[in-house]
Amino acid sequence: YTEMNTKLIGREKEALKLEQCLNSQRSEFVAVYGRRRVGKTFLVRSVCNDSFAFYVTGMYNASKQEQLINFAAAFQRCFKTEEIKVESSWILAFNSLARRLEQLPEGRKIIFIDELPWMDKAKSGFIPALENFWNSWAALRDDVKLIVCGSATSWMISNLINSKGGLHGRLTHRVLVEPFSLYDCERYFTHFG
């Protein structure tokens, strides 16, 4: 638990677990989940020091096409490409992401997908594409840190943690972020006044 994360009051165990994943010598697939407004995104951004190779946040109540446009805009922002290229499917979007990540210098590549459940629309092909991205590319490397986050706890549990499909047993770590205890609330308000 590093000095730069001392602002994470009440999240010491969660921060330590994320740091261990970031510093491991293998690819990691981490699910961070818990109720809305408990600090999941802040935790990930703080521990990772905002040093993401790719970072996208799913859009609430958006269509598959809108989600793909959002993914393409994040791609352009992260990789500073000239134009936004919107892929027609999630398979193609994740393939483009893998190709671009392969062009980066050696070293860990942190991919943060926030509000992941919002990206999975009925018949969108999102989960099979994510499975393919992890199983056929990221898991075969030793430098990918795929961190997914979501407030839809039941979705995270059924589709990732207890997955019966292609992601069965693929998560390397899961981090449950719970609301502050009274003790942590007291520490927080004492520290930040």
Features from the language model and the residues they span:
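Phosphate-binding site recognition
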Residues: 1-193
